[in-house]
């Protein structure tokens, strides 16, 4: 009836997990109690959970990403603390099986639920506004994609308290992830979390590809698209091509585990190296799925705070497209030690070095944009300059690892871990936080606090180097990844420094929380409010509408005649808002409960039941998912019109605020 599920699956004998569970329950009850006390359930359901508005979904994606940051960082600081303590005769405070689950969950959460969710949140808010669209191409799929991602994140966290998580790392290499070596439910939690979130991500890629190709404003040709939109397009193409490979790889691993197949086992004709090829054929494009949009963020931020147009727009676009193509030609550099031979290794090593060329072009373009510019060092520019320094170092170490001979020495060492975090934190996280600071006034109507934002940057920047430069050093000294104990006295001081770095990063996260609190508290101060909709003297269309934008984004769809049309119109004194124009009724999609209610619950039921072999319940969940999608397809009540009078009222109110601001 309940498959493998029993009371013994609840880890009551692990004090850390019991304490965590009690803390989660207390926080959960407090949050639910506050929502109930203030009577916000109806509001949250109608205006947020069922929303198909790309702007609200963007906010929910970013909230999900920040929650994932807290969980993923908790895992990170636990690992750093274990390695600071577990030296010589001291075993540390984490048993090996628990430590293995922590590093596996850390990687899974940070990539799939922090980085991917943050990226999708930025896409959702910015892309439709930058191309002059009123929504995305498929609003329901947008809602469904979010809830698939949220369900997968819930599934990962359920494994904390019911069963266990994978102990095989964030990519679940076989044969360790096969039944013989991982007979528990941990790998199954991993499989279904990745598969469900992968569905959401694939739908997102399709959605934004179609949105950018088909819904650009009149006159916005390919050569007039903002660079951030170009990066979103390239990332969407990468998603559509790469994520099916992940689905197949993890699906075949699931067939090994559930049906006794032998795709990746050491017997029965299986080949574990096939899994590595498949997972990294997805995995390296995934790195660029994450970092290319960060490049797009910097391509918007640097011109805005340098007071100049972006240097080398065409080369930026060509470089982005080159990186997109080359990202599929480098995956073997993750396992030069496989034994494919010198010719294969030489090809992929050279391809890896070549991909640094378009990346270098981007870096020089940003520097030339800043050159002789009127640079304003807002918090956004701190993150941008910090990225340029940090990502350059990460790129240099990447070129080192692209040399097969060097990789034979450094493979599977902490040098590799330091390089990976150098690119993901220094490139992806710095980029997304930069974008959050930049576009926050557009989202919320008020600026983020500059003082706390700069403090957060410095703690993150210094903490990052304290945490990961020591890993380069101990990697050179031979320390391999995934160790939970060591005896080498030369490593211990460096790992203590890394622990200090993790604490500094924790203070950086605390500063970011404080920044949010202070910004919300002081949102009505004149210097913080964004009445104009253009607080940074921006160049692209998103700054031409109010902050926050109305539900329809643009009362009149803009016409684009040049790159940076909005900036040119401002310089020429053209009224971009067309105040007083004759407005028309605007066609918009209706909110839906199909994705946020029925489909979400069914997917969660299916995933949990499949983990525990509760097949009757899994069938119920699967039928629920399929039935919900079919029912939604047959639903005709999916849109409505905003009356022209309502549009005029909203636009006139914004005009009144602008006039009042000018009078002040």
Curated annotation (Swiss-Prot):
<dbReference type="GO" id="GO:0046872">
    <property type="term" value="F:metal ion binding"/>
</dbReference>
<dbReference type="InterPro" id="IPR023616">
    <property type="entry name" value="Cyt_c_oxase-like_su1_dom"/>
</dbReference>
<keyword id="KW-0560">Oxidoreductase</keyword>
<feature type="binding site">
    <location>
        <position position="334"/>
    </location>
    <ligand>
        <name>Cu cation</name>
    </ligand>
</feature>
<dbReference type="GO" id="GO:0009486">
    <property type="term" value="F:cytochrome bo3 ubiquinol oxidase activity"/>
</dbReference>
<feature type="binding site">
    <location>
        <position position="288"/>
    </location>
    <ligand>
        <name>Cu cation</name>
    </ligand>
</feature>
<comment type="subunit">
    <text>Heterotetramer of the subunits 1, 2, 3 and 4.</text>
</comment>
<feature type="transmembrane region" description="Helical">
    <location>
        <begin position="383"/>
        <end position="403"/>
    </location>
</feature>
<feature type="transmembrane region" description="Helical">
    <location>
        <begin position="109"/>
        <end position="129"/>
    </location>
</feature>
<dbReference type="GO" id="GO:0004129">
    <property type="term" value="F:cytochrome-c oxidase activity"/>
</dbReference>
<keyword id="KW-0813">Transport</keyword>
<feature type="transmembrane region" description="Helical">
    <location>
        <begin position="456"/>
        <end position="476"/>
    </location>
</feature>
<dbReference type="InterPro" id="IPR023615">
    <property type="entry name" value="Cyt_c_Oxase_su1_BS"/>
</dbReference>
<keyword id="KW-1003">Cell membrane</keyword>
<feature type="transmembrane region" description="Helical">
    <location>
        <begin position="490"/>
        <end position="510"/>
    </location>
</feature>
<keyword id="KW-0408">Iron</keyword>
<feature type="binding site" description="axial binding residue">
    <location>
        <position position="419"/>
    </location>
    <ligand>
        <name>Fe(II)-heme a</name>
    </ligand>
</feature>
<keyword id="KW-0479">Metal-binding</keyword>
<feature type="binding site">
    <location>
        <position position="333"/>
    </location>
    <ligand>
        <name>Cu cation</name>
    </ligand>
</feature>
<feature type="cross-link" description="1'-histidyl-3'-tyrosine (His-Tyr)">
    <location>
        <begin position="284"/>
        <end position="288"/>
    </location>
</feature>
<feature type="transmembrane region" description="Helical">
    <location>
        <begin position="136"/>
        <end position="156"/>
    </location>
</feature>
<feature type="binding site" description="axial binding residue">
    <location>
        <position position="106"/>
    </location>
    <ligand>
        <name>heme b</name>
    </ligand>
</feature>
<keyword id="KW-0812">Transmembrane</keyword>
<feature type="transmembrane region" description="Helical">
    <location>
        <begin position="190"/>
        <end position="210"/>
    </location>
</feature>
<keyword id="KW-0679">Respiratory chain</keyword>
<dbReference type="GO" id="GO:0005886">
    <property type="term" value="C:plasma membrane"/>
</dbReference>
<comment type="similarity">
    <text>Belongs to the heme-copper respiratory oxidase family.</text>
</comment>
<dbReference type="InterPro" id="IPR036927">
    <property type="entry name" value="Cyt_c_oxase-like_su1_sf"/>
</dbReference>
<keyword id="KW-0186">Copper</keyword>
<feature type="binding site" description="axial binding residue">
    <location>
        <position position="421"/>
    </location>
    <ligand>
        <name>heme b</name>
    </ligand>
</feature>
<dbReference type="GO" id="GO:0016682">
    <property type="term" value="F:oxidoreductase activity, acting on diphenols and related substances as donors, oxygen as acceptor"/>
</dbReference>
<keyword id="KW-0249">Electron transport</keyword>
<feature type="transmembrane region" description="Helical">
    <location>
        <begin position="233"/>
        <end position="253"/>
    </location>
</feature>
<dbReference type="GO" id="GO:0009060">
    <property type="term" value="P:aerobic respiration"/>
</dbReference>
<feature type="transmembrane region" description="Helical">
    <location>
        <begin position="347"/>
        <end position="367"/>
    </location>
</feature>
<feature type="transmembrane region" description="Helical">
    <location>
        <begin position="603"/>
        <end position="623"/>
    </location>
</feature>
<dbReference type="GO" id="GO:0020037">
    <property type="term" value="F:heme binding"/>
</dbReference>
<keyword id="KW-1133">Transmembrane helix</keyword>
<protein>
    <recommendedName>
        <fullName>Ubiquinol oxidase subunit 1</fullName>
        <ecNumber>1.10.3.-</ecNumber>
    </recommendedName>
</protein>
<feature type="transmembrane region" description="Helical">
    <location>
        <begin position="316"/>
        <end position="336"/>
    </location>
</feature>
<dbReference type="InterPro" id="IPR014207">
    <property type="entry name" value="Cyt_c_ubiqinol_oxidase_su1"/>
</dbReference>
<feature type="binding site">
    <location>
        <position position="284"/>
    </location>
    <ligand>
        <name>Cu cation</name>
    </ligand>
</feature>
């Amino acid at each position: 009836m309940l498959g493998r599920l029993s009371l013994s699956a609840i880890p009551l004998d692990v004090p850390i997990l019991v304490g965590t569970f009690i803390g989660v329950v207390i926080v959960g009850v407090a949050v639910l109690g506050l929502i109930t006390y203030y009577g916000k359930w109806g509001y949250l359901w109608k205006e947020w959970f069922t929303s198909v508005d790309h702007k609200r979904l963007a906010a929910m994606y970013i909230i999900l990403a920040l929650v994932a940051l807290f969980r993923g960082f908790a895992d990170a600081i636990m690992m750093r603390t274990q390695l600071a303590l577990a030296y010589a005769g001291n075993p540390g405070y984490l048993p090996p099986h628990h430590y293995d689950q922590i590093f596996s969950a850390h990687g899974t959460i940070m990539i799939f639920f922090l980085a991917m969710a943050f990226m999708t949140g930025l896409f959702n808010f910015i892309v439709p506004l930058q191309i002059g669209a009123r929504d995305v191409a498929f609003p329901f799929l947008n809602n469904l994609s979010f809830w698939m991602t949220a369900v997968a994140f819930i599934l990962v966290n359920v494994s904390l308290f019911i069963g266990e998580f994978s102990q095989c790392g964030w990519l679940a290499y076989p044969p360790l992830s096969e039944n013989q070596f991982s007979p528990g439910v941990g790998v199954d939690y991993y499989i279904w979390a990745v598969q469900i979130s992968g569905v959401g991500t694939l739908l997102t890629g399709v959605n934004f590809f179609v949105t950018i190709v088909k819904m650009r404003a009149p006159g916005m040709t390919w050569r007039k698209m903002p660079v951030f939109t170009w990066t979103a397009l390239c990332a969407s193409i990468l998603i559509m091509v790469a994520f099916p490979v992940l689905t197949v790889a993890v699906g075949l691993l699931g067939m090994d585990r559930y049906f006794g197949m032998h795709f990746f086992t050491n017997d029965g004709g299986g080949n574990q190296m096939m899994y590595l090829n498949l997972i990294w054929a997805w995995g390296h494009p995934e790195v660029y799925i994450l970092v290319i949009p960060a490049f797009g963020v910097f391509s918007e931020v640097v011109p805005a705070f340098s007071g100049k147009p972006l240097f080398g727009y065409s080369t930026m676009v060509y470089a982005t497209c080159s990186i997109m193509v080359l990202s599929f030609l480098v995956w073997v550099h993750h396992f030069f030690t496989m034994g494919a031979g010198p010719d294969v290794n030489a090809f992929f090593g050279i391809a890896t070095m070549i991909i640094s060329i378009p990346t270098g072009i981007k870096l020089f373009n940003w520097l030339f944009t800043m050159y002789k510019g009127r640079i304003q060092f807002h918090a956004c520019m701190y993150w941008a300059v910090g990225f340029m320094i940090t990502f350059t170092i990460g790129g240099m170490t990447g070129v080192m690892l692209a040399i097969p001979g060097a990789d034979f020495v450094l493979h599977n060492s902490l040098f590799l871990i330091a390089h990976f975090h150098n690119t993901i934190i220094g490139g992806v996280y710095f980029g997304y936080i930069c974008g959050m600071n930049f576009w926050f006034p557009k989202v919320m109507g008020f600026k983020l606090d500059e003082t706390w934002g700069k403090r957060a940057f410095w703690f993150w920047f210094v903490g990052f180097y304290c945490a990961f430069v020591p890993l380069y050093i101990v990697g050179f000294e031979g320390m391999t990844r995934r160790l939970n104990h060591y005896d080498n006295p030369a490593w211990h001081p460096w790992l203590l420094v890394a622990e200090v770095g993790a604490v500094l990063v924790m203070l950086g996260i605390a500063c970011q929380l404080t920044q949010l609190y202070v910004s919300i508290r002081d949102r009505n101060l004149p210097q913080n409010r964004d009445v104009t909709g253009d607080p940074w003297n921006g160049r692209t269309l998103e700054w031409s509408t109010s902050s926050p934008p109305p539900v329809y984004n643009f009362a009149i769809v803009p016409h684009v005649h040049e790159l940076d049309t909005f900036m040119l119109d401002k310089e020429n004194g053209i009224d971009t808002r067309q105040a007083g124009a004759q407005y028309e009724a605007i066609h918009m999609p209706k909110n839906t409960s199909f994705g946020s209610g029925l489909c979400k619950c069914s997917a969660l039921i299916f995933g949990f039941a499949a983990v525990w072999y509760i097949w009757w319940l899994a069938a119920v969940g699967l039928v629920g998912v399929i039935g919900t999608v079919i029912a939604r397809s047959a639903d005709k009540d999916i849109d409505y019109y905003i009356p022209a009078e309502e549009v005029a009222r909203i636009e006139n109110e914004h005009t009144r605020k602008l006039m009042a601001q000018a009078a002040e």
